[in-house]
């Protein structure tokens, strides 16, 4: 069997940026069209070539295909997003590192400082939102293409991945348990698989709902 080459830095960067957007805000009508577009299908096909990502990509493809059968799919997805990520009850999956006891408080602020980044004033969510971690990883992967700072950026990438993996499995498990239609559950499983693949732990199994 021919081994597929690992993802390029630019591919990681684009995928992290795409996932950051999906976990940050509800999918609007335009976003729904994009999800079902040939462009996204091609991106998923690229990811699917990696054996460690194939199962989670296939699941997300199924959930995207199922959206065409869902009446008022955009409104339903918005309701799913709200129920999972904006509510504070026990049936949610809050996307904030501080909600998980495994995470050291304020870690993301230190990581951003090391990267020379600041959160935009227009960002109204707490700094430890999942989307900030993913935007940081996107930035770091783009920066890895610049040889003069490659070693420093790679070290910071590893620190960011390790920090994220302290709480991302529990977040993913919460999505699996509390997302009845499964789109965000599948999306979170793909994210976890990509982060583990990026971290060199692609052999670890995806968490399963209890």
Curated annotation (Swiss-Prot):
Q: List, alphabetically, the Pfam families matched.
A: Nitrate_red_del
UniProt keywords, alphabetically: Chaperone, Cytoplasm
Is Cytoplasm a UniProt keyword of this protein? yes
Q: Name one GO biological process term.
A: protein maturation
Q: Which domain of life is it from?
A: Bacteria
Compartments where located: Cytoplasm
Q: Which family does it belong to?
A: Belongs to the TorD/DmsD family. TorD subfamily.
Matching PANTHER family: CHAPERONE PROTEIN TORD, CHAPERONE PROTEIN YCDY
What does the record give as the function of this protein? Answer: Involved in the biogenesis of TorA. Acts on TorA before the insertion of the molybdenum cofactor and, as a result, probably favors a conformation of the apoenzyme that is competent for acquiring the cofactor.
UniProt name for this protein: Chaperone protein TorD
Task: Name the gene for this chain.
Answer: torD
């Amino acid at each position: 069997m021919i081994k597929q080459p690992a993802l390029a830095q630019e591919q990681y960067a684009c995928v992290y940026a795409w996932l950051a957007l999906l976990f940050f805000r509800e999918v609007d009508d335009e976003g729904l069209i994009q999800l079902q577009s040939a462009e996204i299908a091609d991106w998923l096909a690229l990811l699917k070539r990696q054996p460690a990502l194939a199962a989670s990509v296939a699941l997300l493809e199924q959930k995207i295909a199922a959206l065409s059968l869902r009446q008022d799919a955009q409104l339903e997805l918005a309701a799913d997003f709200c129920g999972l990520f904006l509510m504070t009850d026990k049936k949610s999956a809050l996307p904030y590192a501080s909600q998980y006891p495994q995470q050291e408080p304020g870690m993301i602020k230190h990581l951003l400082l090391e990267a020379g980044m600041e959160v935009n004033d227009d960002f109204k969510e707490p700094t430890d939102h999942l989307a900030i971690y993913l935007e940081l990883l996107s930035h770091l992967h783009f920066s890895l293409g610049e040889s003069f700072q490659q070693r420093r950026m790679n070290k910071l990438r590893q620190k960011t991945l390790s920090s994220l993996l302290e709480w991302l499995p529990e977040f993913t498990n919460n999505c699996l348990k509390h997302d009845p239609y499964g789109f965000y559950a599948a999306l979170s499983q793909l994210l976890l698989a990509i982060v583990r693949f990026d971290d060199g732990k692609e052999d670890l199994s995806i968490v399963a709902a209890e």
